[in-house]
Amino acid sequence: MADERGPINKSGPSSTYGATENNGESGGTRGAPATEDVIVIQDSGWYYIKFRFKEPFAEFLGTFILVAFGVGAIAQTVLSKGATGNWITIALGFGLGLALGIAVSGHYSGGHLNPAVTITLAIYRKFPWVKVPVYITAQVLGAFVAAAVIYLNYLPAIYNFAGDKRDVIGANATAGIFATYPQPFMSIGGAFFSEALGTFFLLFVILAMTDERNVPTTRIVAPITIGLTLTAIAISLGFETGFSLNAARDFGPRLFTFFIGYGVEVFTAYKFYFWIPLVAPIVGGLVAGFVYDSLLYWGEKSFLNKNVHHEHRAVA
């Protein structure tokens, strides 16, 4: 089966995809020569492309699912004027969207779906820095496309709600369906703290769920737990800023609204608030990584544990 070594180009039209060695411990006769199971493709077409770019494709699709369900829940609530949704349904939309997005993408990319997650794992878990811009680009694009799809789906309702106007602020504002905007009474410092705090909790749970020495989790338990964490954050901490907690989730849809007629106000509104969801979640994630690794994590991947080495010894 294919593994992380990726495609190996051979002479001629065929390509060999990955290989898993049989060392005699399983799947073969003990002591037999090492062999490899390979997938040989007779051309280097689409299969080659989707294998080579499986990680960004997975991040794109996972983030698309997260934002589509979350923004869709906001659209349904706002455009129906609360008749078919409320804050709880929005919180559930994002929580379920995150759980499903991780479930879809986790096997292929790890299911980051958030630049704060990617950067935190690069600093504290040795995630390759060369992949960081690729992951973040895929996440932003996934969020952008999700916003476009939800906009097209709800376009009749948007016209019914606001007519031809595309307002960022006001009674008929619809920009907040797609990107986050703070409550008018919030200061920049207060909004920054709120976004960082929410992301702290999210990343803390993610680090716990991916800690091999913590309670064992499965591909089902981890996404559900992380999704429920986002729902809990939304219910308890989300009111003041709209709980972006994710630069891609906010910037992708914000960029989309800029292009479709909401104008530069999507960036200038509320004292240029747009930079808060870009920076604060990353800060919150880094603090979460520092606290978790300082108090709980025993693994060797963290630079905080650079003097720790684990040895496997036979027990008499």
Swiss-Prot record:
Polyethylene glycol (PEG) stimulates whereas glycerol inhibits the aquaporin activity. A motif (NPA 1) lies at residues 114-116. Keywords: Cell membrane, Glycoprotein, Membrane, Repeat, Transmembrane, Transmembrane helix, Transport. Residues 81-86, 153-187, 241-271 are extracellular. GO terms for molecular function: glycerol channel activity; water channel activity. Induction: Expression is increased significantly in arbuscule-enriched cortical cells and extraradical mycelia of maize roots under drought stress. Residues 1-59, 108-131, 209-219, 293-316 are cytoplasmic. Residues 1-31 are annotated as: Disordered. The chain crosses the membrane at residues 60-80, 87-107, 132-152, 188-208, 220-240, 272-292. The keyword Plastid does not apply. Gene3D superfamilies: Glycerol uptake facilitator protein. InterPro entries: Aquaporin-like, MIP, MIP/Aquaporin, MIP_CS. It is a multi-pass membrane protein. It comes from the Eukaryota. GO terms for cellular component: plasma membrane. It holds the Pfam family MIP. Aquaporins contain two tandem repeats each containing three membrane-spanning domains and a pore-forming loop with the signature motif Asn-Pro-Ala (NPA). AQFP2 has NPA/NAA motifs which is in accordance with the fungal aquaporins (NPx and NxA). Water channel required to facilitate the transport of water across membranes. Stimulates plant drought tolerance by facilitating the transport of water from the arbuscular mycorrhiza fungus to host plants. Belongs to the MIP/aquaporin (TC 1.A.8) family. This is Aquaglyceroporin-2. It comes from Rhizophagus irregularis.
